[in-house]
């Protein structure tokens, strides 16, 4: 990134509509590398650092020269990008061609380019002389989207901007695909990746490191937001390697059915959904069903003496005593004394969703816009509520998040508990979350960071002095109390195989984290910085941000104010051109946010420049139709 741009800002105000200095510095780098040099870039910015706005600002710059195609994982994130495109346009302060920008979900893009599951090669010529931006690039490989991107790269010879907060998902294979997509050479994966018998033994070898450094030199942008504007994280439980884990000791009932499931149903235990299920809760015969939908249709079927299922509804005293779930026993007991909002991650959406719903209802927590809990717990005279986010409710996710993130819900009085499966990706932001729970141990370091990154990010907290509490729950045997202090103690399979499933997953997670961190440090070292005058294509964008910062603190100045002129000439060296720019923003009534007047426009009054507050007003039920194309970004589901 261009550190010369960062040096132009002093005490940047982040609390107003703004482009952050590192975003402008990165934008400069992207314009030079992708547009000027026609080279692909991996934007490896850690979650919460504003990759989306950087990508959209770049798309606006690039739209003057080429067509820009933006691919996002799903329809919900498509909506987020469309909303953020409006934000980016308002901050851009320069010309762009909106008709040249196309935003698609991966499924929508697939339907445009495949006929009967076969790539329409004749149609790919439309992507000549274009730029592709791919959000969450680490997730596109191993499916048709990844295949299509590779074909477009080879056929059209175009550059890619790949966005990722975690370019390694499970193994270095993902990074290998990214290298292949970004470089002009074909990668032989067998040469760069060493494979053992286990996933954790998949490593980027020395040849791979050299290939990485050679092919991606000058193509990596790494950035991690300083944590000075973030709350501290307080991990709960006992020390486990470099973190803390809550040991949830199973009851005899849970341990018995847990062991039956482990022996009878788990041929590849680490990746078997049955172990995810029984580590969360056991449900008797439900554990042994391969088709849960069949059992959901049973009427008054007994799972345990105190637990039955009827047409997919669980009921019975066991939902309160919770011998079926050591994790929920800890969770329910703990939340009674906690204040604030909770975000709870789980991975087994069908089974887990059933368990969560009826345990919560039975223990006095009401479903948001649904059933009321038994003897409901209250907050501010209203029931404490929960919601469960799974892939089955995509259409209502945005509305739910609007409620969860609203200022009125900072205390959780509207919606306190948000349970989410894997549908929630890093593109979503959760605000004012004070408690983060892991009901399922994540598969990868990337996934773990994404879950934390949904909540713990810049601008998500009004008060950063209060910590965020993290609870990593592990279901363990009733007599299990091992101290896990070093990975070196668990290098032999026979030692690992006797461990509880969740503990094994944690160890595998840490083994893979070791390799991930090694590669991330290489990528970080490859990220280049330089100090140059801003690229001509972003001068007006940069000046717009400098002006916003200046007039935040200045409500009224002399027209020939020396500080304003000095600021503008730091970018436009010619004083006459600088004065012309000042004339343009005043006569054009540039929009600013002022600390006294809030939303304001710049005006000339006698020999002064003043900030004039404004408010939009309208008559009820009056519609205005603008026949000019106000918003031309094309999107498809």
Swiss-Prot record:
Q: Which GO terms describe its molecular function?
A: ATP binding; DNA binding; helicase activity; hydrolase activity
Under which main EC class is this enzyme filed?
A: hydrolase
UniProt subcellular location: Virion
InterPro entries of this UniProt entry? DNA/RNA_helicase_DEAH_CS, Helicase/UvrB_N, Helicase_ATP-bd, Helicase_C-like, P-loop_NTPase
Cross-referenced Pfam families, in alphabetical order?
Helicase_C, ResIII
Listed binding positions for ATP are 45-52
**Helicase ATP-binding domain spans which residues?**
32-185
- Locate the motif DEXH box: 135-138
Domain Helicase C-terminal: residue ranges: 327-507
**This protein's superkingdom?**
Viruses
- Name the keywords, alphabetized: Activator, ATP-binding, DNA-binding, Helicase, Hydrolase, Late protein, Nucleotide-binding, Transcription, Transcription regulation, Virion
One cellular component (GO) term of this entry: virion component
Q: What is its EC number?
A: 3.6.4.-
Quote the subunit structure annotation. Heterodimer of a 70 kDa and a 82 kDa subunit. Part of the early transcription complex composed of ETF, RAP94/OPG109, and the DNA-directed RNA polymerase.
Protein family membership: Belongs to the helicase family. VETF subfamily.
Question: Any idea what job this protein has?
Answer: Acts with RNA polymerase to initiate transcription from early gene promoters. Is recruited by the RPO-associated protein of 94 kDa RAP94/OPG109 to form the early transcription complex, which also contains the core RNA polymerase. ETF heterodimer binds to early gene promoters.
**Name of this protein:** Early transcription factor 70 kDa subunit
What is the species listed in this Swiss-Prot or TrEMBL entry? Vaccinia virus (strain Tian Tan)
Which gene is transcribed and translated to give this protein?
OPG118
